[in-house]
Amino acid sequence: MVEKMNEQIYIIPLRDVKRSPRWKRSNTAMKDIRAFLAKHMKSEDVKLDASINEKVWERGSEKPPRKIRVRAMKFDDGQVQAELAQE
């Protein structure tokens, strides 16, 4: 049985996404979210929930949100699972 180690809520800024080409912005945002969580949770094994994907791609490829609120849970085996935090 894998136990939950810790749980954090992060507000991830996505303003650097605006530097990438317009048609790549949502792809870049997903990569940035994964990299942010890997850095702050100190784990390379990051799984993103479908709710995060839906929120980023909600307005298409060219207009991702400026920031996103995420709940990340790190388990004893080092895996990080992230989902969209409820307001």
Swiss-Prot record:
The keyword Membrane does not apply. It comes from the Archaea. One of its GO terms (molecular function) is structural constituent of ribosome. The keyword Ribonucleoprotein applies. Gene3D superfamilies: 3.10.440.10. Signal peptide: none annotated. CDD domains: Ribosomal_L31e. GO terms for biological process: cytoplasmic translation. Pfam families: Ribosomal_L31e (PF01198). Keywords: Ribonucleoprotein, Ribosomal protein. GO terms for cellular component: cytosolic large ribosomal subunit. HAMAP family: Ribosomal_eL31 (MF_00410). Belongs to the eukaryotic ribosomal protein eL31 family. This is Large ribosomal subunit protein eL31. It comes from Methanosphaerula palustris (strain ATCC BAA-1556 / DSM 19958 / E1-9c). The gene is rpl31e.
